[in-house]
Amino acid sequence: MVSVLRTLRHLGAAMVLLMSISLPLAAATHAQEQISDNELVVYTAKKIITMEPAMPEASAVAVADGRIVAVGTLESLQSWTSQKGARIDRRFEDKIILPGFIDPHVHPSLPAVLTQFPFLAPDDWSLPTGEFPGAKTPAAYLTALTALVAQHSDSSIPFITWGYHPLWHGKLDRDALNKLFPNQPVMLWHRSFHEIVANDAALALIGLTEDDVRDNRMVNWHEGHFWELGMFALIPKMPFLFDPARFAHGMVNFIDMVHRGGVTTALDMGIGIFGNPTAETTLIRHTMESRQAPARVILTPIISDFISRGRTIAQAMEEIDEWRAGNSHRVLIDRRFKLMMDGAIYSGLAQFGFPGYIDGHEGVWMNPLSITTEWAQAFWDAGYQLHAHTNGDASAAALIELLKTLQKNTPRADHRLALEHFAYTTEDQNRQLKTLGAVVSANPYYHFILSDMYSEQWLGADRGNQMVRLGSLERLGVPFAFHSDSPMAPLEPLTLLSAAVNRITINGNLTGDLERVSVDAGLRAITSNAAWVIGWEDEIGSIRAGKKADFTVLESDPYKVKPSQIKAIKIWGTVFEGVPAPLPAAAR
């Protein structure tokens, strides 16, 4: 615990320094028009897909004061335009307008750190910092890694790349990296974010010794492997991650990723992952507001932050109330709380029921279930919406039992407890989720990237092919949303939609075809149903009078293109609270 607290103090100091020095770097205003608050503007379009059953399509939408005034056609809006006067904006007449996309599970600080470095993962990545092709074999990975290391020119910090995964790239430990790069400091950041492998030169450069980690059970010093709590020994030796200029530019990269994906509302599903939630919140708020970002971010307090800082439940609730008092236009905290059930799916630490993993290894519980239940009950009783990080079917079973306990102790209607991630469940569990009134925030990208490898090495084809069983949820009527958990998947709702509709894996295989979803259900999972899952259906998610005027503007109609072409649909940009925000031409 002492080493953890020391880590938190170190990171907190770095974040405070970042706040004091880097703010001017983020002060550039985002490319966004200015519209008078009381001006009535009517946007016309080739088609407006409203996600409203009573009027599914329209061709004109009137907005004022950041909200939707009326929807229909220019003719049907005449009662407004003739009496109030309006400016007709026809720039979208050859485009498709949808409700602003929602990503209900991101982590802004992760891209702020990771986009400082090149990506080299099994999958391809298109980022504000460049194009990063994937490597799916050990040979391809080593070839690309060697080329990237050769380009590294800053001798003051190790070469770091994010995206390494042994299932694709083979086992690379300290000795292997020493042989490949005997004189160059090299660190491989695991695709899960929860692990790092380093060579001798890197450990020497950052000044980490074996004595520093002797008592840490999540460090294998011989292999240069640090995971989960072992990262607390490593990160404090890497202050360059929080260098003011580097981190500020990384946060701007996150904002650009949100915009490029057509997202107008995102949920940070775990504020304080680097140990100082107050400083992190302030930084996110300043960057979003000073740049007038065309999106809002809703911050979610997380159980692991409070436990790692030694806070009681009562102290946690007091802190959350204090944070909420600082809510701003684009960055806010409402009444939601995140629980952690099992381990990361990318690391093979999810909890699976019998027969478990083929190789016999076991998953982990992030906290003892008794502790999770205690915190869940307190926040449930206080009226919070609960979100629970849940990957395997054993974890889903534990969450279902937890929900039954909560309802028995303190019955609540319309609680919308959200199962987050949804890597694998059974049909019976999905039925129970429906009966219990739960909702699901799923990452359909898991099937795309992990299904083949899990089928071959960890679960077998029956369970591996059925990862992320969204078709079951659609048939049962369980409300579900899609999320990226950025950077666990690209912050691109259309990519998530494509993964769910097509179920084509990274290797080009169609697996679990009965778990595909319809295009309509998939679009709702990034608009109206996503709003329902997060409890914001009165404000966002569809285009109707009274809601916020948040739109995503596409070049093609996702209902009309072939399912295989959904991912390729070009995004013009967004409209945030009535104000157009086009993407730079190079990003369209």
Q: PLM features: what roles do these ranges have?
A:
Residues 1-8:
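N-terminal secretory signal peptides that target proteins for export/translocation
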Residues 11-24:
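Bacterial N-terminal signal peptides
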Residues 34-45, 49, 53-318, 333-335, ...:
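Divalent metal-binding segments
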Residues 287-296, 321-330, 381-382, 404-415, ...:
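Secondary-structure transition/capping motifs at alpha-helix termini
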